[in-house]
Design a protein with these regions (language model features):
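Short, acidic/polar
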Residues: 1-8, 67-86, 146-160, 292-309
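Glycan-recognition patch characteristic of GH18 chitinases/ENGases
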Residues: 1-84, 331-336, 343
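Short, well-ordered coil/turn segments that N-cap beta-strands
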Residues: 9-10, 46-50, 88-92, 134-136, ...
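Conserved, mostly hydrophobic/aromatic
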Residues: 12, 52, 94, 128, ...
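Glycan-binding loop/region signatures in secreted carbohydrate-active enzymes
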Residues: 54, 213-306, 333-343
């Protein structure tokens, strides 16, 4: 039964509303693919929190426009309050990827043109908190890749931001992406721990930090060099160096998705023949020259004694629930291991 799998879920975030909706006059009806009460009834926990996520990858314009002035921040915040009042949601999750740059448009709008956003990010949060009050939840999705963390935050802005945020969901996945040129685990233990420690060392309280899990698989085309070693070897060029356009040499699919036809043969080799080091699960297909990276239930479970427990983190989250359907094998693992963690 699906209800058994979700019995331990405490927070559900509905993604996404576009950030630009909150810049001007509020719409007569907020664009949500479902309604909060319908979602609430699907989950057993009486005190389930349902949040609305704003933004997501590639959606930065509304955040930038709001952050640029005090008037813009105030309007943005008041519209978020209106949306929460109208939908009955328990809070808002801000997915600005990312203040300061390194987003989808990083080749079109340089990081230097967006550097001003770093300093005003806490000001935007302050305005939203003032508008929605202390009883509504406000969280943020934040990057896990070191180069993105460095662009988005300073220690001072993180410390100030945490005055207003209830918690941060640290995206400890996609830690290898098409901008890289050597293979690595996309959600490994070591690179996840580096991300977590970066936030903890820069002012994020452990109890407000959540570790992210990926319910999907990633693949990357490589050079012949990977025949010598699959990790740390060169990939082919995966992104246009001038435009940032995806060259189709990497990708992802979830456990719920149909495996793309052109990848099916390779992935069917990868699953039973996967390698595991102390950091994570991977496979290199010598015939197709494809590097695969994904979390198995076993590798997910290892992140608790390696990261969650010693760092005393507040929780864990996954992107995203539907991506683990219909078997929910990875969700079951998170539930079981987190229950054990809570007893320690």
């Amino acid at each position: 039964m699906f209800s058994v799998h979700i019995a331990d879920v405490t927070h559900v975030t509905l993604a996404f509303m576009k950030s630009s909706i909150f810049n001007g006059k509020p719409p007569s009806k907020w664009p949500l693919f479902t309604d909060v009460e319908t979602v609430r009834k699907k989950f057993p926990k009486k005190d389930l929190a349902v949040l609305i996520a704003i933004g997501g990858w590639g959606d930065t314009r509304g955040f930038s426009a709001a952050a640029a002035s005090q008037m813009g921040r105030k309007a943005f915040a008041e519209n978020i309050k209106a949306m929460l009042d109208s939908t009955g949601a328990d809070g808002v999750d801000l997915d600005w990827e990312y203040p300061g740059g390194n987003g989808e448009d990083y080749k079109q709008i340089t990081n230097s043109e967006k550097s001003w956003e770093v300093g005003v990010y806490p000001k935007l949060l302050a305005e939203i908190r003032a508008a929605i009050g202390p009883d509504k939840i406000m969280s943020a999705a934040v990057p896990g890749k070191p180069v993105d963390i460095q662009v988005a935050f300073t220690k001072d802005t993180l410390v100030e931001a945490m005055e207003y945020l209830d918690y941060v969901n640290i995206m400890t996945y996609d830690l290898m992406n098409r901008r890289d040129n050597v293979t690595a685990h996309h959600t490994g233990i070591d690179n996840s721990l580096i991300a977590i420690d970066t936030y903890l060392n820069n002012g994020v309280p452990a109890e407000k930090a959540n570790l992210g899990f990926a319910f999907y698989v990633k693949w990357f085309r490589t050079t012949e060099e990977c025949a010598q070693k699959a990790l740390g070897c060169k990939t082919v060029e995966m992104e246009d160096p001038k435009t940032g356009r995806d060259l189709g040499q990497s990708g992802a699919f979830s456990w719920h998705d149909k495996i793309p036809t052109e990848l099916k043969k390779s992935f069917e080799k990868a699953v039973p023949n996967a390698m595991y080091d102390d950091d994570g699960n991977y496979y290199w297909d010598a015939e197709e020259k494809i590097f695969w990276s994904w979390d198995t239930p076993a590798s997910m479970a290892k992140k608790f004694p390696a990261i969650v427990q010693p760092r005393k983190l507040g929780g864990v989250f996954a992107w995203g629930l539907g991506e683990d359907a219909n078997a929910f094998i990875h969700l079951k693992t998170l539930n079981a291991v987190f229950r054990k963690y809570l007893k320690l």
